């Protein structure tokens, strides 16, 4: 089963990389796929185009994010169809985020049904409680405390936390008034700046290499994805 899962993940990485290359003009240097606990997560490395490199040197990161959001809006339906047609994976919603300074990114999806291909050791109850405490703290500081938080560890280096019911009234009004893109860009920066990485690293006893956030504003759901450093 492990060999089959690895083969599927490698095939997903190859097909996804080709599709991203067709939309962005350059694919990621490497893709790492995790398929577990009803989630598909793809970690991208060395993912930046020559034009984006120029804009980044000119401190135009926001312009890059805006452009990528437009491209991803067109790309996501094709990604969803490809995963379903080639691998039988039914994604409910696709999420994504970037770390332009590191030239990294993540694309992930929550899957329909119990599509559980494998499991990894769960977080300890103490770790989970403390992680949720920090997620509640920074989410409350940015908007309001979540009604519910659920976290799973997909593998040695990937943790995903789901937050429900986090939007405040002004955010809901901005979304209904057509300012969803502006809200997304602002919240990305805000949440990453206020999360206490060193505290979480002390709980996990593992460094955090990358941290990503995204939302389904219509369902009032937010996610945090932690990519951990490889254990030495």
State what each model feature region is:
Residues 34-51, 137-175:
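An N-terminal amphipathic alpha-helical segment
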Residues 99-156:
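Surface-exposed beta-loop interaction hotspot
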Residues 199-232:
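Extended, charged low-complexity segments
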Residues 1-4, 27-28, 63, 81, ...:
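A cross-kingdom feature marking solvent-exposed beta-strand/loop segments within repeated
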Residues 70-114:
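Hydrophobic, ordered structural segments
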Residues 72, 76-79, 165-207:
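Short, hydrophobic/π-rich interface segment
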Residues 1-49, 53:
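N-terminal ordered "arm"
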Residues 49-63:
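A low-complexity, Ser/Thr/Gly/Pro-enriched, surface-exposed linker/loop concept
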């Amino acid at each position: 089963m492990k060999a089959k899962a690895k083969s599927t993940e490698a095939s997903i990485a190859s097909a996804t990389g080709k599709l991203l290359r067709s939309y962005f003009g350059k694919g990621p240097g490497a893709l790492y796929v995790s398929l577990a606990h009803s989630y598909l997560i793809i970690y991208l490395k060395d993912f930046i185009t020559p034009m984006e490199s120029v804009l980044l040197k000119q401190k135009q990161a926001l312009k890059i994010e805006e452009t990528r959001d437009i491209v991803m809006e067109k790309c996501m339906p094709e990604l969803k169809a490809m995963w379903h047609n080639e691998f039988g994976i039914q994604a409910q919603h696709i999420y994504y985020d970037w770390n332009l300074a590191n030239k990294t990114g993540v694309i992930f999806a929550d899957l329909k049904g119990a599509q559980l291909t494998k499991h990894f050791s769960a977080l300890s109850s103490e770790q989970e409680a403390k992680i949720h405490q920090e997620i509640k703290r920074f989410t409350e500081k940015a908007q309001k405390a979540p009604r519910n938080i659920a976290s799973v560890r997909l593998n040695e280096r990937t943790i995903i936390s789901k937050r429900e019911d986090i939007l405040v009234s002004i955010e809901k009004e901005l979304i209904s008034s057509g300012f969803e893109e502006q809200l997304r860009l602002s919240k990305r920066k805000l949440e990453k700046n206020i999360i206490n990485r060193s505290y979480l690293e002390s709980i996990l006893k593992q460094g955090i290499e990358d941290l990503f956030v995204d939302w389904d504003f219509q369902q009032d759901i937010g996610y945090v994805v932690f990519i951990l450093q490889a254990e030495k």
